[in-house]
C-alpha cells in the first residue's frame, strides 16, 4: 500500500532546487555545513582575515543548494575537502572575494583569491564540465538589474585555482548532462527583461579556448516571471532534458520541457509555442518530478472534473494527470490520474478502468466523495475517503461503516465503499486502499 507521496506531486512545499543553480536537493543543514573541525575553522577564518586586511563581512549565497559563506567540498577527489569562502572587506561594499583554500601538510593555505565587482552572491554549484577528475566551481553573482545575474567559472588542481572564461548572464543556472556522455553542461535560463529575451542556453566547455561557449539556445515563454522548480532527468527513450516549472504574474503555473536534439544539433522547447496555450497551464500547485521512481520525469496537467449543473455549494475537485514527455513526437503521454484533497493532505489515484467523463469527485470538509457522472449530472456515490481526528477515531465517534486505511498522530484516514460488483466502477476494498496516499505522513 502506498501511503506517502513526494511533495513534488502535491506541490505542498517549494523544493530546494526552485531557487536555481542545481537540480540536486540537499537539506538546509547540509547547505549550511561549516568547516569540519574547530581547528580547521580557526585556520580558515584567519586566512580570510589576513586577506581582508581590516575586517570583513561574510557573504551568503541567496539561492541554490550551497547557502553557506564558507563551503567545504572535495574538488579534486583526494577525499580531503577544500574550502571556498565569499566575503567583502571593510571598505569593499561593491566587491566580493571568492577565496579558495586547501590543506597541505596539515596547514591551510590560499589556492586562489578572485575579486568580483558585485554586491551579492546569487548561487554556487560544483560540476564536472571539463571531463577532468576535478570539479569546477560555478559562482553566480547578482547585478543591479532584477532577474539578471552573471556566471563565473573556476577550476582547481594541485593546490592552485584558475579561471575558465564564462561571463554569461542568467536568471537561473543548472548543471547536468543532456546526453549519456557523462560530461556535464551548464543550462542557463533567462527570464524576459527589457534587455534580455526569455531563453535557455546550453553551455559546454571548449578545451582549446578554456572557456564556456553557447552550444545552442532556444526561446522560452516570456510571460514566466519566476522559475518555481527545475529538474534534469530522462524524458523518454533515454533522451535527457531539463523540465522547468515557472509561474506567471497571475501565479498560474506552466511547464517547459527542453532537450537537445542530436540529429538537428538544436535545443527544443516544444511545449512553448508563441500564441498557443501551453497544455500544462494550471492553477494547482503541482510540479514536475519523478514521482514513481522509474527515472522518468513526470509532467502534470490539470483539468476540472465534470461539474456542469452541480450546486455551487458542492466543491468539485480537479483531476491531476501525470504525463511523460515524448521527444520523438514532442507530445505528452498520459500515465496516471489523481484527485487531491489539499486541505487534509491526501489524494486518490483514479482507477485506470474508469473512463474520463464518467465520474467526478467532490471535496466536502474532511472528505472526498466519488460519484458516477451520468446524463450530465451527479449519479450514485461510489466511495468516500474521510479524514477523522485521530482521538475521535479512537473513541469511535461517527465512524460507523468506515474502514481505516492509515493513521498518524493527527488524523485517521478511512474509507466507505459503495461500489457494486456489476458496475463499471466496481472496486475492492484493497483497491481503494492501494489508490490512497497521504502527504508528509508523521
Where are these regions (language model features)?
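Sec-dependent N-terminal signal peptides of Gram-positive bacterial secreted proteins and lipoproteins
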Residues: 2-26
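Beta-propeller-forming repeat regions
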Residues: 19-363, 371-373, 392-395, 401-413, ...
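Secondary-structure transition/turn motif
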Residues: 371-378, 416-421
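A short acidic-to-branched-hydrophobic micro-motif
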Residues: 374-392
Amino acid at each position: 500500500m502506498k501511503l506517502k507521496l513526494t511533495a513534488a506531486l502535491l506541490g505542498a512545499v517549494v523544493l530546494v532546487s526552485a531557487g536555481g543553480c542545481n537540480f540536486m536537493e540537499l537539506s538546509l543543514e547540509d547547505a549550511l555545513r561549516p568547516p569540519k573541525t574547530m581547528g580547521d575553522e580557526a585556520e580558515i577564518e584567519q586566512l580570510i582575515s589576513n586577506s581582508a586586511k581590516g575586517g570583513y563581512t561574510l557573504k551568503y549565497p541567496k539561492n541554490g543548494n550551497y547557502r553557506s559563506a564558507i563551503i567545504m567540498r572535495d574538488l579534486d577527489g583526494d577525499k580531503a575537502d577544500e574550502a571556498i569562502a565569499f566575503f567583502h572587506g571593510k571598505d569593499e561594499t561593491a566587491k566580493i572575494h571568492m577565496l579558495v583554500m586547501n590543506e597541505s601538510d596539515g596547514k591551510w593555505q590560499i589556492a586562489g583569491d578572485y575579486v568580483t565587482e558585485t554586491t551579492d552572491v546569487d548561487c554556487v554549484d560544483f560540476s564536472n564540465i571539463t571531463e577532468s577528475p576535478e570539479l569546477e566551481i560555478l559562482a553566480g553573482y547578482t547585478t543591479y538589474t532584477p532577474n539578471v545575474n552573471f556566471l563565473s567559472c573556476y577550476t582547481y588542481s594541485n593546490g592552485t585555482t584558475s579561471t575558465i572564461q564564462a561571463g554569461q548572464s542568467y536568471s537561473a543556472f543548472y548543471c547536468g548532462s543532456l546526453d549519456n556522455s557523462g560530461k556535464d553542461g551548464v543550462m542557463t535560463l533567462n527570464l524576459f527583461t527589457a534587455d534580455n529575451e526569455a531563453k535557455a542556453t546550453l553551455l559546454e566547455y571548449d578545451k582549446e579556448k578554456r572557456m564556456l561557449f553557447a552550444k545552442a539556445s532556444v526561446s522560452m515563454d516570456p510571460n514566466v516571471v519566476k522559475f518555481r522548480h527545475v529538474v534534469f532527468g530522462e524524458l523518454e527513450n533515454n533522451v535527457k532534458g531539463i523540465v522547468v516549472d515557472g509561474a506567471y504574474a497571475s501565479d498560474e503555473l506552466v511547464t517547459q520541457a527542453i532537450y537537445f536534439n542530436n540529429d538537428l544539433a538544436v535545443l527544443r522547447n516544444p511545449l512553448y509555442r508563441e500564441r498557443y496555450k501551453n497544455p500544462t497551464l494550471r492553477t494547482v500547485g503541482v510540479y514536475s518530478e519523478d514521482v514513481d521512481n522509474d527515472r522518468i520525469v513526470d509532467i502534470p496537467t490539470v483539468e476540472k472534473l465534470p461539474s456542469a449543473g452541480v450546486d455551487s455549494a458542492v466543491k468539485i475537485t480537479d483531476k491531476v494527470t501525470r504525463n511523460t514527455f515524448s521527444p520523438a513526437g514532442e507530445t505528452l503521454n498520459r500515465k496516471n490520474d489523481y484527485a487531491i484533497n489539499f486541505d487534509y493532505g491526501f489524494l486518490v489515484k483514479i482507477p485506470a478502468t474508469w473512463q474520463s467523463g464518467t465520474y467526478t469527485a467532490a471535496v466536502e470538509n474532511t472528505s472526498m466523495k466519488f460519484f458516477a457522472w451520468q446524463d450530465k449530472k451527479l449519479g450514485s456515490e461510489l466511495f468516500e475517503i474521510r479524514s477523522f481526528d485521530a482521538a475521535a477515531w479512537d473513541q469511535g465517534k461517527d465512524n460507523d461503516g468506515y474502514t481505516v486505511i492509515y493513521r498518524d498522530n493527527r488524523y485517521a484516514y478511512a474509507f466507505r465503499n459503495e461500489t457494486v460488483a456489476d458496475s463499471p466502477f466496481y472496486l475492492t476494498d484493497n483497491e481503494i486502499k492501494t489508490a490512497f496516499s497521504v502527504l508528509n505522513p508523521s
